[in-house]
């Protein structure tokens, strides 16, 4: 007698339970608002440089240190998430980065701003591993790739919101007021505290660790054990390529439009708003593809297509070529290439080290990604190359590396997340 898959008899959005939806929304809110607090800084680097009388390269270093601090925050959050649950580090991280951004808006000196933006990086890094593990462990296999794309693409929604705030409010509230808006995400903590539950797979895994006296006390070390280190190294390579690509495209884009081309705030905000809307929509579309053609190819294909697009618009000074090219890139190296990051990263590692592994591999990539803005600024300003050519070089190298790492990586489409003890 044939076994009927009852889950496929209902629409995919009805398959998840209420608790699964609540968990996913928590991760979505955390990531979207994380993006808002982080990307607002990309739009106000020039006025910060002017107000404090520091070189633009120094302001770009603030951006770099923020990214580097993400690794420390991520590893701490990953360890805490694997030990006590996904909810607690998620709440701490959201409250942390909200307060730091708000306080940075009162900066009396450049170094005050530097310190609190660096501390913001710690909280930012702590959000992603906790949120990704919470969402992906809670979600059914059938549509996990699609919802991974929607989740990761929500970074584009946060960037869209920060761009809209910049375009509409900058002239009236200035760069300080834009940083003060960063306190609003703190309200999400109330939602997570009262409505979100831990994923059952994590709860059962922790129960087994205790019952069998096989607790994994240092999950970071376990992902470098024999049999795991190759997977870990490939995941780090993958994320390094991806984040070098992302920050080559986006890190100094607004500054390029301001300094090299003299565009107004509204002209700068327009391509960023539309591109990030496309990032969100295309992430869902490529996520849908990931549930059918596999996680890797749903990222490799847009990654390869994005390289010639970069040559087309990055070297142009025509406003509409830049707008159209940047928006198209949002569907490729923006939303498409990153659509499967939450699902693919979490599916690669066992439950007892999932948050830690995701934290380390993803945010090791931010170390290299964080070098990109000051390097681009150095060549653009000190060598009078302008921003477009260094941005293009970083984009091409990063995208090619990203695709190679994915090609050699494992395929995880359809993989179930189980509470079995693998590393203990």
Where are these regions (language model features)?
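Cytosolic juxtamembrane N-terminal segment immediately preceding the first transmembrane helix
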Residues: 1-36, 41
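Extracytoplasmic gate region of multi-pass secondary transporters
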Residues: 42, 229-280, 369, 373
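Helix-breaking motifs and short loop linkers at transmembrane-helix boundaries and internal kinks
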Residues: 53, 85, 106-112, 140, ...
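Central cavity-lining transmembrane alpha-helices of secondary-active solute carriers
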Residues: 64-77, 273-285
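Conserved MFS/SLC helix-loop-helix module at the cytosolic interface between two early adjacent transmembrane helices
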Residues: 72-108, 293
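Cytoplasmic helix-loop-helix junction between adjacent transmembrane helices
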Residues: 116-153
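Helix-loop-helix hairpin linking two adjacent transmembrane segments in secondary transporters
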Residues: 151-194
